[in-house]
């Protein structure tokens, strides 16, 4: 067997082992998805969420990020989650099922937020992938643009934003838009993010619009 083949085989094995580790760890800890570890890593580096904060979690189902957020905000905080898909209840999380592009769903979400605005907007949204970059990338960019629009509607001054973005066409323009809206923007690739994935997370702090 050639060195190249050994390397490819080893890489596949390592990736499978890596994936199994986070899937099993999520199950062991009672977390609903391996994605929860991504938010934990972002929190460890950037301290986005503190006790008493109000957090909006977009694309929340099955609830991995909401599980982490509600622990971090504590009894005096508030987590408002929204997804088109259903999500089993999480104690302390106010879940709204629906498409926030629809006016009635958006109004319901804004009612839950109230007049005080929110401290953090989270988005781990991703489209159903077809395998075609020409289809998937525009869909993915559309979702992250919606998430940034939500910041403009609900985020308090100096608030924070964490969003999953897929690198590709439209990424640079989106990065500029986020930098225009926030004082500091960092790009993160959590260890729990699959190495083969083009996903990265933008962590933006100091909302200024």
UniProtKB/Swiss-Prot annotation:
Its main location: cytoplasm. It is an enzyme of class 2 (transferase). S-adenosyl-L-methionine binds at residues 63, 65, 83, 99, 124. Keywords: Cytoplasm, Methyltransferase, rRNA processing, S-adenosyl-L-methionine, Transferase. It is found in: Cytoplasm. Its EC number is 2.1.1.166. It catalyses: uridine(2552) in 23S rRNA + S-adenosyl-L-methionine = 2'-O-methyluridine(2552) in 23S rRNA + S-adenosyl-L-homocysteine + H(+). GO terms for molecular function: rRNA (uridine-2'-O-)-methyltransferase activity. Pfam families: FtsJ. Belongs to the class I-like SAM-binding methyltransferase superfamily. RNA methyltransferase RlmE family. PANTHER family: RIBOSOMAL RNA METHYLTRANSFERASE, RRNA METHYLTRANSFERASE 2, MITOCHONDRIAL. This is Ribosomal RNA large subunit methyltransferase E.
């Amino acid at each position: 067997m050639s060195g190249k083949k050994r390397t490819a085989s080893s890489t596949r094995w390592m990736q499978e082992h890596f994936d199994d580790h986070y899937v099993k760890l999520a199950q062991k800890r009672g977390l609903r998805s391996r994605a929860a570890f991504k938010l934990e890593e972002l929190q460890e580096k950037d301290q986005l969420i503190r006790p008493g904060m109000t957090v909006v979690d977009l694309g929340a189902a099955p609830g991995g990020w909401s599980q982490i957020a509600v622990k971090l905000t504590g009894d005096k905080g508030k987590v408002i989650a929204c997804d088109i898909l259903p999500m089993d209840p999480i104690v302390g999380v106010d879940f709204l099922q629906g498409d926030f592009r629809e006016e009635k769903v958006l109004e319901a979400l804004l009612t839950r937020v109230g007049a005080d605005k929110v401290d953090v907007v989270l988005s781990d949204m991703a489209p159903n992938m077809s395998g075609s970059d020409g289809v998937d990338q525009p869909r993915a960019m559309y979702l992250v643009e919606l998430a940034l629009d939500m910041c403009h509607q609900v985020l308090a001054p100096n608030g924070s934003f964490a969003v999953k973005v897929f690198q590709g066409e439209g990424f640079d323009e989106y990065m500029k838009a986020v930098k225009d809206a926030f004082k500091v923007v960092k790009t993160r690739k959590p260890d729990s993010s699959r190495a083969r994935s083009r996903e990265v997370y933008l962590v933006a702090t100091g909302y200024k619009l």
